[in-house]
Amino acid sequence: MNNTIQNSTITDDLKYVMTLDKLTEYLSCLICLPGALCNAILIYLIWKRTPIQMRSYAIYILNFALFDFATCIISFFSCQQVIFSDFSLVYIFHGPCKYVSPWFCYFCHCFMCHALAHSQWILLGSFIYRYRVLTGETPTAKDLIRNSVALYSMSLCFLLVYVFDNSDSDLLFQILTRVHPEYHYDDESIWKKSIVVSGNISAFAPITLISILYMTIPCVPIYCAILYFRHNTRVILNNPHINLSPTAKSNHVKLIRALTVQAGIPIFWLVASGIFTMSQFGIIGGPIPENITFRLMDCIPLISPIVTIIFVQPYREGLLKVLLKNSGLFVPNIIGSSIVDQTVAVTSVFGPKVTAFVQTQL
């Protein structure tokens, strides 16, 4: 009789939840492992294929690649799922970290969050850099290093504070089973294994609340600022007084396209933050928001290096040369029409820096 009831419970109430949990594990592998590979390739291209005129801007790109690589690896090891339990934040970890300890899983969660936050600040910095170059300023490598350190200091402080805010795992598990008895997490005969949990007892505890605000609130002003600098950059590039050759004009269009694509990357962060906030306050709920929040954020470090390799000419050509090197195919020094005509003359109020900017970006 008990077995019949248990099988009925699994079939009717838990099969869907268990399927989504398993899908989350598969998605983590499908997103994080290719993301780590793409970022490793980008790091290699930055090291080997960065031209002299791009060395300052490459500091920001290297920031992206290093932190996105770390995010992919750490997220794969944690593969967290957030269960909103009243005002407690309970994370269930499906990744390999569960074989170490709940605290290590929580550290992975904190590290991933701080790395993602830093990447968003650097993305904003890269848009500001492009705008400054087009308006006649010349940020040096030292300037960008100082900016990177200043931006990272915020995320580092977040990590150092948040990592010591974890609550007792046994108490969190009790809260989880009390608030969500329908999941039967305390029944190992159903789940076949013990559930590894960590998190925060109260989302309104000072440190936890500050950490949540840092991860959710800045994404809105950051995205607005990105759109602002993207708009101003497009205005400059569309200035009719900038005289470009046909090849340069073609690359000018590609640059605007690249800016549009890159400006869309934070949308994943915005959507994930919105889902997190609405779930925390009970506006939405269920296994889909619980599983999808961090998988959406995992998409950011996967897409970012792909966009960079596609739209930054030296890295795109460098990768193609590596791929074609041993194929027996002819490898030209200049691939297609992606390189800007080096003899183009630009006469405008913005000077030749506009030409150099377009040449190194596309």
From Swiss-Prot:
Bilayer topology term: Multi-pass membrane protein
Subcellular location: Membrane
Keywords recorded for this protein, A-Z: Membrane, Receptor, Transmembrane, Transmembrane helix
Transmembrane segments: 27-47, 57-77, 104-124, 144-164, 209-229, 264-284, 292-312
GO cellular component: membrane
Its job: Thought to be a chemosensory receptor.
The name this protein goes by in its record: Serpentine receptor class delta-2
Lineage: Eukaryota, Metazoa, Ecdysozoa, Nematoda, Chromadorea
